[in-house]
Curated annotation (Swiss-Prot):
One of its GO terms (biological process) is innate immune response. GO terms for cellular component: extracellular region; membrane; other organism cell membrane. It comes from the Eukaryota. This is Eumenitin-R. Expressed by the venom gland. Belongs to the MCD family. Eumenitin subfamily. Linear cationic alpha-helical peptide with antimicrobial activities against both Gram-positive and Gram-negative strains and against the yeast C.albicans. Shows moderate mast cell degranulation and leishmanicidal activities. Has a very low hemolytic activity. Induces an ion channel-like incorporation in artificial lipid bilayers, forming pores with relativeley high conductances. Its mast cell degranulation activity may be related to the activation of G-protein coupled receptors in mast cells as well as interaction with other proteins located in cell endosomal membranes in the mast cells. Keywords: Antibiotic, Antimicrobial, Fungicide, G-protein coupled receptor impairing toxin, Immunity, Innate immunity, Mast cell degranulation, Membrane, Secreted, Target cell membrane, Target membrane, Toxin, Transmembrane. Signal peptide: none annotated.
Length: 15
C-alpha cells in the first residue's frame, strides 16, 4: 500500500 499516494489521492478528493 502506497500511503503517500493514498494521502495525496484523498487530499485531491477533499479539495
Amino acid at each position: 500500500l502506497n500511503l503517500k499516494g493514498l494521502i495525496k489521492k484523498v487530499a485531491s478528493l477533499l479539495n
